Amino acid sequence: MDQQLTDPTTCLAWLEGHARARRAAGLRRSVRPRPAVDNEIRLDLAGNDYLGLAQHPDVIEAGVAALRVWDAGSTGSRLVSGSTALHAELEAELAAHTGFASGLVFATGYAANLGVITSLVAPGDLVVSDEHNHASIVDACRLSRAEVVVVPHLEVAAVEAALTGRAYRRALVVTDSVFSADGDLAPLAELHTVTRRHGGVLLVDEAHALGVVGARGEGAVAAAGLAGEPDVVATVTLSKSLGSQGGMVLGPVAVRDHLIDTARTFIFDTGLAPAAAGAALGALRLLVADPSLAARSRARAQELARVADAPSPAAAVVSVVLGAPERAVAAAAACREHGVAVACFRPPTVPPGTSRLRLSARADLTDEDVALFATALSAALAEPAGVPGMR
């Protein structure tokens, strides 16, 4: 056998070439630990804490109380030792708030999407998926082994065509409600009409809508009048508006029962940590008690969009498209130098040529925060960064 093929020092040598290619394209990423107290950052617009509840004392205390009662970890699968009374309370109360009959907690929002899609469709079935759907949906579609048709963004007619022109046993139409990069809103009522006409199920990822969309922050599905419909299922994350971690599938009781029996990311994963469940439940109760949080988050998002001359957002996500990845990286770094943390989205997260600053509005932002962002962004876009068109 060729010595080159048996030398253990060369089996991963190809990684270096891939890293060089990503660096040349401006697509290298790095992990930067966030300090408990960051003296350089005066304003965080990078995280997804849309309601400002991650640091709320009641939410923190709810997590601490869960630790004291239920220990540090859930210790096993939800079907073994990983379910607590907190999980059951969270499922019942979040389902009630969003208008669904039942809910099932998963360890992450990613796992919720993987679990529900791979449990609802299989070979012989059809999945119709928006081209801008989250990576967890993309991966779930691949794992399902169903036929997958990716349709142009927000084009209901393309969904209709996909459902009309194929033979299939069952159909699932999948979409984000609020899209994570652009912050735009899917036409849920129209999608539901088309899906129902063809006997399919509509699955909506509400990660960026829960807590922000709707008069009470109940989400886009409920705001569209679709919560509780027998052919509508939703997923949510507990890591954004609820300031914690985890995910949930919401829908008819039959869907919950089916997932308990078949969803591999539920059956074979350790249950959500009690502290995360407790914190999410504490945050949910704050939202229920003060539904104005949703409107305040949306209002601040509109203000940030006006400052940035960005499209009007549907929820809390504000997208400032700059084009080249180098330009977006430089602008994000310049904002940080002025005390403002913003997210930088580059391919493959967004399409080539649309690298951007991605801002997350929060319900607890102040007028002074908005003014600080305006100053930082103006300075960032005025500074040359050695990239054509940076000014």
What spans do the regions from the language model cover?
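PLP-dependent enzyme catalytic core of the Aspartate aminotransferase-like
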Residues: 53, 57, 61, 65, ...
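Active-site phosphate-binding strand-loop segment of PLP-dependent enzymes
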Residues: 149-204
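PLP-dependent aminotransferase class I/II
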Residues: 235-237, 241-312
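N-terminal "arm"/small-domain region of PLP-dependent enzymes with the aminotransferase-like
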Residues: 2, 7-72, 200
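Conserved PLP-binding catalytic core of the aspartate aminotransferase-like
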Residues: 298-339, 349, 353-354, 361-363, ...
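Conserved PLP-anchoring active-site segment centered on the Schiff-base-forming lysine
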Residues: 116-135
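Conserved N-terminal alpha-helix of the aminotransferase class I/II PLP-enzyme fold
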Residues: 61, 69-108
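Conserved active-site segment immediately N-terminal to the catalytic lysine
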Residues: 199, 206, 210, 218-238, ...
